[in-house]
Swiss-Prot record:
Keywords annotated in UniProt: Cytoplasm, Magnesium, Metal-binding, Nucleotidyltransferase, RNA-binding, Transferase
Catalyzed reactions: RNA(n+1) + phosphate = RNA(n) + a ribonucleoside 5'-diphosphate
Name of the coding gene: pnp
Compartmental location: Cytoplasm
One of the protein's GO biological processes: mRNA catabolic process
Upper taxonomic lineage: Bacteria, Pseudomonadati, Pseudomonadota, Gammaproteobacteria, Vibrionales
SMART domains recorded: KH (SM00322), S1 (SM00316)
Protein name: Polyribonucleotide nucleotidyltransferase
């Protein structure tokens, strides 16, 4: 039934990688089952032979999905099936998309969909690397015009050594988590989080990862040669040279002048007007022309105009030199009721960032195939349409917002205090209120400021900067603090976050081949200078965490009880702790070792909660008098609570000096009384006396009662 499948196995670091095709999903354009030490991923590629008429973009979609059966689990929740992609799945989909997208021809507009499904998981082998490898293999045997294959490698920095594809266990002790992907000749994508590593160490890790993944690229080429899928007979559309010349004649000079307007919205308006006028003029000359084709040529001309000016050494779009950072404005404490806030403005990019402190109960529970964990540091990035002067749909976060938030979080993670040092869950929200490039790096700067304003003891200030590149032949210019247009029209987006001591995050996306180690070194060094300049300005506004947290933030008080007393504080079905929280207005968390954390915005509430817990956990002593409350009345006496929930019996004979016929004539449920502990038996039952407590506390009254008898 099946033709003989093609299988390719090779050693990659400490792992054995296997690629297989020919058995599953035979109606797809291409499909590969890939495995790396029991972590298996199935990747399919479907590409349409024809593009949609008039389509002016490349519709590439990457879907990454983790099936719970891969880990031998059934999904939680009511529906018991996987739902919308998690944040982790979205980030992995972006990780796959970024290095493959620039390898398709710019004129290729056919729809391509990649679906990657994790079908088996080894908890110590992250599926993202094998998924990238499988995607590269599937595209390489699909016959589509794909200028690959690519390789992928994760690099760790453990005990001063670079480690290829470290396990999840090893990563816990690594100062670096770096993913690098590229072709045989060039690096295309880098995503990393680091603990203040130097520029030289980061560059060495990138080069190391690229060198190591040559094994993968060689294996995929051999795999593709064995599969031998015929290539598509796709050719780029022939460019209308006459129309291109007409467009250049009408628009080149005007576009060059327009790109000397430094204000973004005014420049956009002028460029838009020029394009509309050129389109109208050409359509008047020849109605048969395609407006989309004209606009495509105008876009290419616009790109060429901007790039030519930069290569020629002219000032940039907004008048800056290549290594200049835009004007900075830094403010903290801008919102009165938030726990911490900052407004960070860099040119026409602005972020309003807030920090909120919560208890450990507020931590994000992440339930992935690799297991469950809690995240006590959350960073959410919002990019509303108004920040670029547009209208648009406002709803759940898009892939880009999730990705930018993760990058900003990576930049800050290395300086965050541990939960033991600062027992709070911290949520940061970055609202981008203006955007003209590098909003994720503005979020890094704003987050550092807002955390300090909130009193979070971060280890150092962190700043981020986005670098760009324009390369024509052997000539190139590295740009600091790029604008949105420079990002769009340039060849590289290179984002670096870090402290004065080193780099904490690095993200790089390269659109062309030929980015050398020399260029990356220049970009890193130039970024270091820009980062330190920004840090100097930030430190003038606030250089360390405030001495105290906001008066509106919960204050966490810690106390310790014996672990065998935990059940007393919790109570039956959680009744005691629930009542404590409700009646004192606090949040109480109890750990297995008896550590209790009490969070309250008011000191008096915390003190009351502590007093009551101490009361509950205190040992009842024979002979001592305690205040109590009547809980139940029975024929032979009354049950009274002492020291919180502890309950003892006051026998009818121990209520008063005189003889009592009915307990209810002397005591009522809810009545507060003073009781003396007479005895605690072997079973822990407490015998109490109101009569003796009264005699000790009010001896005169007790004597009068005896005399009356």
């Amino acid at each position: 039934m099946f033709e003989k499948p093609v299988v390719k196995s090779f050693q990659y670091g400490n792992h054995t990688v296997t690629l297989e095709t020919g058995v599953m999903a035979r109606q797809a354009t291409a499909a590969v089952m890939a495995s790396m030490d029991d972590t298996s991923v199935f990747v399919s590629v479907v590409a349409k032979k024809e593009a949609v008429a008039g389509q002016d973009f490349f519709p590439l979609t990457v879907n990454y999905q983790e099936r719970t059966y891969a880990a031998g689990k059934i999904p939680g929740g009511f529906f018991k099936r996987e739902g919308r992609p998690s944040e982790g799945e979205t980030l992995t989909a972006r990780l796959i998309d970024r290095p493959i997208r620039p390898l398709f021809p710019s004129a290729f507009k056919n729809e391509v969909q990649v679906i990657a499904t994790v079908v088996s998981i080894n908890p110590d082998v992250n599926p993202d690397m094998i998924t990238m490898i499988a995607t590269s293999a599937a595209l390489s045997i699909a016959g589509v015009p794909f200028n690959g294959p690519i390789g992928a490698a994760r690099v760790g920095h453990i005990n001063g050594e670079l480690v290829l594809n470290p396990s999840n266990t090893e990563l816990a002790n690594s100062k670096l988590d770096l993913v690098v992907s590229g072709t045989e000749a060039a690096v295309l994508m880098v995503e990393s989080e680091a603990d203040n590593l130097s520029e030289e160490e980061m560059l060495s890790a990138v080069v190391f990862g690229h060198d190591q993944q040559q094994v993968v690229i060689k294996a995929i080429n051999e795999f593709a040669a064995e599969v031998a899928t015929p290539s598509w007979n796709w050719e780029a559309p022939v460019v209308n040279a006459e129309l291109k010349a007409q467009v250049a004649e009408l628009a080149e000079t005007r576009l060059s002048e327009a790109y000397q307007i430094t204000e973004k919205m005014a420049r956009y308006e002028q460029v838009g007007a020029i394009k509309s006028e050129v389109v109208a003029a050409l359509l008047v000359q020849n109605e048969a022309l395609d407006e989309r084709e004209i606009r495509g040529m105008l876009g290419a001309l616009e790109k060429n105009v901007v790039r030519s000016r930069i290569i020629a050494g002219h000032p940039r779009i907004d008048g800056r030199e290549k290594d200049m950072v835009r004007a900075l404005d830094v403010r903290t404490g801008v919102l009165p009721r938030t726990h911490g806030s900052a407004l960070f403005t860099r040119g026409e990019t602005q972020a309003l960032v807030t920090a909120t402190l919560g208890t450990q109960r507020d931590a994000q529970i992440i339930d992935s195939l690799m297991g469950e964990k809690k995240d006590h540091f959350l960073l959410h990035y919002n990019f509303p349409p108004y920040c670029v002067g547009e209208t648009g749909f406002v709803g759940s976060p898009k892939r880009r917002e999730i990705g930018h938030g993760k990058l900003a979080k990576r930049g800050i993670a290395a300086v965050m205090p541990s939960v033991e040092e600062f027992p709070y869950t911290v949520r940061v929200v970055s609202e981008i209120t203006e955007s003209n490039g590098s909003s994720s790096m503005a979020s890094v700067c704003g987050t550092s400021l807002a955390l300090m304003d909130a009193g979070v003891p971060i280890k150092a200030s962190v700043a981020g900067i986005a670098m760009g590149l324009v390369k024509e032949g052997d000539d190139f210019v590295v740009l600091s603090d790029i604008l949105g247009d420079e990002d769009h029209l340039g060849d590289m987006d290179f984002k670096v976050a870090g402290t004065n001591a080193g780099i904490t995050a690095l993200q790089m996306d390269i659109k062309i081949e030929g980015i050398t180690k020399e260029i990356m070194q220049i970009a890193l060094n130039q970024a270091q200078g820009a980062r330190k300049h920004i840090l100097t300005v930030m430190d003038e506004a606030i250089s360390g965490a405030r001495e105290d947290i906001s008066q509106y933030a919960p204050r966490i008080h810690t106390m310790k009880i014996s672990s065998d007393k935990i059940k007393d504080v919790i109570g039956k079905g959680g009744a005691v702790i629930r009542a404590l929280c409700e009646e004192t207005g606090t949040t109480i968390e109890i750990e297995d070792d008896g550590t209790i954390k009490i969070a309250a915005t008011e000191g008096a509430a915390a003190k009351e909660a502590i007093r009551r817990i101490e009361e509950i956990t205190a040992e009842v002593e024979v002979g001592k008098i305690y205040p109590g409350k009547v809980m139940r009345i029975v024929d032979f006496g009354a049950f009274v609570t002492v020291l919180g929930p502890k309950e003892g019996l006051v026998h009818i004979s121990q209520i008063a000096e005189e003889r009592i016929e009915k307990v209810a004539d002397h005591l009522q449920v809810g009545q507060e009384v003073q009781t003396k502990v007479l005895e605690i038996d072997r079973q822990g039952r407490i015998r109490l006396s109101i009569k003796e407590a009264t005699a000790e506390l009010n001896p005169v009254a007790a004597t009068e009662v005896k005399d009356a008898e």
